[in-house]
């Protein structure tokens, strides 16, 4: 901007495209002060070096004419944080000079000439305060702003030269503190008094010269209330684009009779609300995909039944178990009236319990838990591969060399405790299921799926499986 008018300038349509650096790393350029870099706005900066003084003057001048810091940042190609910091410091202290990079401020040592002048002022006017003496030193050009002693230093000199009582000293210190707070350095009176008393030699320096431009104090703005017509216009524009450019915002501001800044803030808030609503909708859609109830990790199970150590001899099999290696199996969910311990009547040599002992022609004993029909309803049950021994798996794959068995297929009847033909099992199950239909919906049930003996050899034939609950059997299922 070459000239600054009182009104905020309108943005012009851009001319030919400018090639700004698009890479993620800033470009390095050579400057008289050293190696500089290019920021995201295209401006050159040097790390560790303050912003040049003429740019600081320009920032204050543009802010004095009512231009917003974001516009100043774009036009001067200075970062927004730098612009805000310079303006904030100028409002507080009236100075645009950069702060100290590091270290502490050197202690001011009062010269003898300054001490004599302080004593002279005090003799001429005994009621003069320390801050008044300090202002008079600046006004008479005895000191400049860099060498003038502080209020506390002047008070210390006065106490040493003019001895007073402790009460008078305390009263003087209290009054001086109150007056110094009223006319602090960053106050309007302090800035004006320092500027008026500044020596003429300092005005020629570019660093020490301060712009004499009062800035408007930032006041809290009342919340904007939009009318229905304005909201309708803004919503229509938001449906077209969520990120309108400066020209679209200005046109929309003219139609809605708002400022471009209010339109920009409204779009920012509207985008935030839209993102929040979109996230909530995605979460609801995801919840609809999830089934209503996942089974918990530990489902409530029915009380487990343990078989007593006493083995009951089945009435249908006259031969007792004589193999010491035979084991009594204790399934967890079965009622205590069933004991799976029997022998094969057609093979008296083996005297092995069906599916329980480990002999050369029989299956190895199952583990103490059965396989659930589906899913992890009971996490304590292993898979069926854990219940079969390697000898059984070898028998299933090798059908040769196995002695011939009778023609009848036998299946274990858990309710009678012995071996029965499959027809009798079905009959007995149908009789017991007449009064147990209400138990089909029990949550935890397990199936006992025993293998059968076939005519050609040992194999796993699909037979009817039974699910056992707490009180009886449920509907049969097959593999």
Curated annotation (Swiss-Prot):
Residues 1-21, 165-228, 309-351 are annotated as: Disordered. Transcription factor that may regulate cell proliferation, migration and apoptosis. Involved in neural development and myogenesis. Transcriptional activator of MITF, acting synergistically with SOX10. The keyword Transit peptide does not apply. Residues 113-161 are annotated as: RED subdomain. Changing residue 81 to A: In WS1; originally classified as Waardenburg syndrome type 2. Residues 172-188 have a biased composition (Basic and acidic residues). Disulfide bonds: none annotated. Belongs to the paired homeobox family. Residues 309-329, 338-351 have a biased composition (Polar residues). One of its GO terms (cellular component) is chromatin. It is found in: Nucleus. This is Paired box protein Pax-3. The record marks 319-320 as: Breakpoint for translocation to form PAX3-NCOA1 oncogene. One of its GO terms (molecular function) is sequence-specific DNA binding. It is linked to Waardenburg syndrome 1: WS1 is an autosomal dominant disorder characterized by non-progressive sensorineural deafness, pigmentary disturbances such as frontal white blaze of hair, heterochromia of irides, white eyelashes, leukoderma, and wide bridge of nose owing to lateral displacement of the inner canthus of each eye (dystopia canthorum). WS1 shows variable clinical expression and some affected individuals do not manifest hearing impairment or iris pigmentation disturbances. Dystopia canthorum is the most consistent sign and is found in 98% of the patients. The modification Phosphoserine is found at residues 201, 205, 209. Can bind to DNA as a homodimer or a heterodimer with PAX7. Interacts with PAXBP1; the interaction links PAX3 to a WDR5-containing histone methyltransferase complex. Interacts with DAXX. Interacts with TBX18. Interacts with SOX10. Residues 34-161, 219-278 bind DNA. It comes from the Eukaryota. InterPro entries: HD, Homeobox_CS, Homeodomain-like_sf, PAIRED_DNA-bd_dom, Paired_dom, Pax7_C, PAX_fam, WH-like_DNA-bd_sf. Keywords: Chromosomal rearrangement, Deafness, Developmental protein, Disease variant, DNA-binding, Homeobox, Myogenesis, Neurogenesis, Nucleus, Paired box, Phosphoprotein, Proto-oncogene, Transcription, Transcription regulation, Waardenburg syndrome. Its main location: nucleus. GO terms for biological process: animal organ morphogenesis; apoptotic process; muscle organ development; nervous system development; positive regulation of DNA-templated transcription; positive regulation of transcription by RNA polymerase II; regulation of transcription by RNA polymerase II; sensory perception of sound.
